[in-house]
């Protein structure tokens, strides 16, 4: 009777633009949408603060973030994995 149903959490992929805070990174997520009237493809972007426990994500890394419970006033996302490390030139 009391089955535990796990909620489907939103997951996004974005690039880390700042890692200056302790245990927090700022992730820029870009998405492409079609303009409703003119039909042109537009790039929309949003920045999210995400919790990273062991400092595994650095600036320039491509990461996957997922929604979680509120960790602080601005953090409701957590880094689940690093998809691609930043290349040092």
From Swiss-Prot:
It comes from Azoarcus sp. (strain BH72). One of its GO terms (cellular component) is cytosolic small ribosomal subunit. HAMAP family: Ribosomal_uS17_B (MF_01345_B). Keywords: Ribonucleoprotein, Ribosomal protein, RNA-binding, rRNA-binding. Belongs to the universal ribosomal protein uS17 family. PROSITE patterns: RIBOSOMAL_S17. The gene is rpsQ. One of its GO terms (molecular function) is rRNA binding. One of the primary rRNA binding proteins, it binds specifically to the 5'-end of 16S ribosomal RNA. This is Small ribosomal subunit protein uS17.
């Amino acid at each position: 009777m009391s089955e535990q149903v796990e909620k489907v959490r939103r997951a996004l992929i974005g690039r880390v633009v700042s890692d200056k805070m302790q245990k927090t990174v700022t992730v820029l997520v870009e998405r492409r949408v079609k303009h409703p009237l003119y039909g042109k493809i537009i790039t929309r972007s949003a920045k999210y603060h995400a919790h990273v426990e062991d400092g595994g994500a650095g600036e320039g890394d491509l990461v996957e973030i997922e929604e979680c419970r509120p960790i602080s006033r601005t953090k409701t996302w957590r880094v689940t994995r690093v998809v691609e490390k930043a290349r040092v030139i």
